[in-house]
Swiss-Prot record:
Bound pyruvate or other intermediates in the aldol addition reaction catalyzed by BphI allosterically activates BphJ reductive deacylation activity. The lineage of its organism: Bacteria, Pseudomonadati, Pseudomonadota, Betaproteobacteria, Burkholderiales. NAD(+) binds at residues 162-170, 273. This is Acetaldehyde dehydrogenase 4. The active site is at residue 131. SMART domains: Semialdhyde_dh. The keyword NADP applies. The gene is bphJ. It catalyses: acetaldehyde + NAD(+) + CoA = acetyl-CoA + NADH + H(+); propanal + NAD(+) + CoA = propanoyl-CoA + NADH + H(+). One of its GO terms (biological process) is catabolic process. It comes from Paraburkholderia xenovorans (strain LB400). Pathway: Xenobiotic degradation; polychlorinated biphenyl degradation.
Amino acid sequence: MTKKIKCALIGPGNIGTDLLAKLQRSPVLEPIWMVGIDPESDGLKRAREMGIKTTADGVDGLIPHMQADGVQIVFDATSAYVHADNSRKVNALGALMIDLTPAAIGPFCVPTVNLKEHVGKGEMNVNMVTCGGQATIPMVAAVSRVQPVAYGEIVATVSSKSAGPGTRKNIDEFTRTTAGAVEKVGGAKKGKAIIILNPAEPPLIMRDTVHCLLESEPDQAKITESIHAMIKEVQKYVPGYKLVNGPVFDGLRVSVYLEVEGLGDYLPKYAGNLDIMTAAAARTAEMFAEEILAGQLTLQPVHA
């Protein structure tokens, strides 16, 4: 039996519940706590049925147990508004925070683009951008590694059913954080992000459109090759990530059309927006866990 790093999840909504399913399959992570604020929530009930410890007292219900239970990694799937407070309390106990809200107080992480850059930095909070960011930033990066991107615009369309109350509260933060990461991680000089919640029934699969405006005539062969290589990288942890059309070249503009199907761990397969976020968070946490297990990373308490 290999040793696993113990984890806690804050936020038993759509994202937290889907993430829990993924962590249970991880070879190096062991989820032991699920934290919520509503004792009647479906997510807390499910976690309890799986034998996970739960509290409905928010992060303050977890803090007294973290050291005794050996929790070293905490995932926050709540809301940007409460994340800073949650992170401060968790970091003070020497646990690493993986932020699945658009709070973005820590550095951005999009695994296929910059996961390796986070190795050995001793960071105690990393931000997973947003579901739209995880789906589209690899495509912007695939273009910008070939030639400069003056402007990158992404449009993420998700089913209304897959967007819970936390996501809805954070729509403005979603667009700001995603646009910022299109620039910082994707490499575009200027970024823009648009999210659409589609109420259609039956719910539609997650769809993403990426437009890149280049500074010079596109090298079509190189860009096409780079995009296909990046798609394969993302598919390693989100098998349902696929190129529907493109790259389409029109003057200086390159457009890519994507679809993301989920594994159906919690919501049905149309909710690929959950998968791309939770799989990226799990992959990021696994990298930190592997470092901890190898003795290359010792987490230190951070006092605000």
